[in-house]
Amino acid sequence: MAARPLSRMLRRLLRSSARSCSSGAPVTQPCPGESARAASEEVSRRRQFLREHAAPFSAFLTDSFGRQHSYLRISLTEKCNLRCQYCMPEEGVPLTPKANLLTTEEILTLARLFVKEGIDKIRLTGGEPLIRPDVVDIVAQLQRLEGLRTIGVTTNGINLARLLPQLQKAGLSAINISLDTLVPAKFEFIVRRKGFHKVMEGIHKAIELGYNPVKVNCVVMRGLNEDELLDFAALTEGLPLDVRFIEYMPFDGNKWNFKKMVSYKEMLDTVRQQWPELEKVPEEESSTAKAFKIPGFQGQISFITSMSEHFCGTCNRLRITADGNLKVCLFGNSEVSLRDHLRAGASEQELLRIIGAAVGRKKRQHAGMFSISQMKNRPMILIELFLMFPNSPPANPSIFSWDPLHVQGLRPRMSFSSQVATLWKGCRVPQTPPLAQQRLGSGSFQRHYTSRADSDANSKCLSPGSWASAAPSGPQLTSEQLTHVDSEGRAAMVDVGRKPDTERVAVASAVVLLGPVAFKLVQQNQLKKGDALVVAQLAGVQAAKVTSQLIPLCHHVALSHIQVQLELDSTRHAVKIQASCRARGPTGVEMEALTSAAVAALTLYDMCKAVSRDIVLEEIKLISKTGGQRGDFHRA
């Protein structure tokens, strides 16, 4: 790293005009042509010198796949003056206490450290960064950092027209403005606030002050604003805009589902039908956008394809959240608290080692669209506050002690039981459990970091819950006659038309013995096929819904709730699966629960079979069943 200060010193020397002291020699004024030629040659010599003496890129900001991270996004605040539907819940989000947020000095200290290591672009984000009172001062301080080429801001535009002259004077060089509709009434519906005309005023102020291009970010959502694609594209005819159409992405609290997403190819086809002459524009290195231009238009359009065609291979971005956590991937849920280490007095080298370790753990690419949609992540406004809440509270809270701040195991990933809440009808989202209310107080999240080993280090709980109670309940009525066979021994479907509707609940389980090699790959999420646990969990949910199509004499049941939980057992190198189903009707749901557990187990086998064929599926069994004429059943 010693080479870097030397290189920067050489750059400073070469930037300065050549000066010399004369002891009486006459001064010769070159002609204009010679001056221009000499200046051009001098620039060429400087560039050649810098190429030959360039400092190596920081090892701390280079991941294991050789990606050099030169772009840092810093969240200045969690607060926002809008409530965009795709970004945060309508009621807002619990905010981190002010004492736990980065101070201005801490922001600048971290920025200075990252720039020293090779970051040359910083973008200020939020929340809404322009509601932070000292945002102009922060930009001015960043502008003084040698080596920082670009200071950008992503804003909703509400305060932009008022602040932009000051921000430009302070050193702001790039602007992204979020705008998802050109219809004022629809704007108010999407963001749940007024302000459309303020945003448009901000866009025109940016153009007036000479920003080119002014980037406009538009999240495209089916049934909401996909019909405005052509209107947005038409804006680029007379304005120096880069309208960036962003695929709708899943973040906690935005009720994401696949049906809302409009893919890049679909958007591109729509624009091409109107402007067949649309041309592809060469992309900059590490660009996230696929850029196109309509001949004769002043601006251009771009597509950010986070969901359908990821750009992980060229990712050069790191993020620091408002509470000081380093996040190496937008779609990841792991983070490192730089704030805590900074306040504990960590030296610059210690901070660099922490940063380097986090960057080194960055994966080759994020999970696919299907897996991302299930991941527990911060609401977009926070990026990301990670607490695992169950999908529904237990009928008997005393069955287990549930602590939302205690994360078990070695691979903190997500609350599997809550992932399907946005995809499958009937899943219930609970109120905050009493214990969480006690821990969190009124309106603020607390986070718990610990390096201690879990009291049960052999298990990894992916979703809070307990395995079925062993106590029998109710009379055990049995039949000595098979209900699906008639008097002549032929298959027959039971007539349930006259049976009363009652609440039916069934829980089934299965165990998959993976072996040490496959188990390790599943635990570390390193299978080439993807996240085996997520795929198996969703397969179990889907299987429960189609049980009547798989089991010939099984009735179709309108399930009101499906929950699939997976737990890693390192002592047996196994995955334990528990599936529960609920419905109100004339027939039970034990077949749905059993099918769910079995198919989840089969899916795990399929995901891991390339690694080992010595995988055993066992203990597929009914754990409990309630409701119905024959009484309740709980396996002893």
UniProtKB/Swiss-Prot annotation:
Entry protein name: Molybdenum cofactor biosynthesis protein 1
Pfam family, one: Radical_SAM
Record-linked SMART domains: Elp3 (SM00729)
Tagged with keyword Cell cycle: no
Species of origin: Homo sapiens (Human)
Disease per UniProt entry: Molybdenum cofactor deficiency A: An autosomal recessive metabolic disorder leading to the pleiotropic loss of molybdoenzyme activities. It is clinically characterized by onset in infancy of poor feeding, intractable seizures, severe psychomotor retardation, and death in early childhood in most patients.
Binding site for S-adenosyl-L-methionine: 86, 127, 178, 249
Catalytic activity: GTP + AH2 + S-adenosyl-L-methionine = (8S)-3',8-cyclo-7,8-dihydroguanosine 5'-triphosphate + 5'-deoxyadenosine + L-methionine + A + H(+); (8S)-3',8-cyclo-7,8-dihydroguanosine 5'-triphosphate = cyclic pyranopterin phosphate + diphosphate
GO CC terms of this entry: cytosol; mitochondrion
Compositional bias segments (type: Low complexity): 463-475
Domain named Radical SAM core: residues: 64-277
Region Molybdenum cofactor biosynthesis protein A, residue ranges: 1-383
N6-acetyllysine: residues bearing it: 198, 528
Residues involved in [4Fe-4S] cluster 1 binding: 80, 84, 87
Region ranges (Molybdenum cofactor biosynthesis protein C): 414-636
GO aspect biological process, one term: Mo-molybdopterin cofactor biosynthetic process
Region (Disordered) residue spans: 456-480
Enzyme Commission code: 4.1.99.22, 4.6.1.17
Tissues where this protein is expressed: Isoform MOCS1A and isoform 2 are widely expressed.
Catalytic site positions: 606
Subunit structure: Isoform MOCS1A and isoform MOCS1B probably form a heterooligomer.
This protein's UniProt keywords: 4Fe-4S, Acetylation, Disease variant, GTP-binding, Iron, Iron-sulfur, Lyase, Metal-binding, Molybdenum cofactor biosynthesis, Nucleotide-binding, Phosphoprotein, S-adenosyl-L-methionine
Known cofactor(s): [4Fe-4S] cluster
Pathway, per record: Cofactor biosynthesis; molybdopterin biosynthesis
Gene3D superfamilies: Aldolase class I (3.20.20.70), Molybdopterin cofactor biosynthesis C (MoaC) domain (3.30.70.640)
Cofactor note: Binds 2 [4Fe-4S] clusters. Binds 1 [4Fe-4S] cluster coordinated with 3 cysteines and an exchangeable S-adenosyl-L-methionine and 1 [4Fe-4S] cluster coordinated with 3 cysteines and the GTP-derived substrate.
Residues where [4Fe-4S] cluster 2 binds: 312, 315, 329
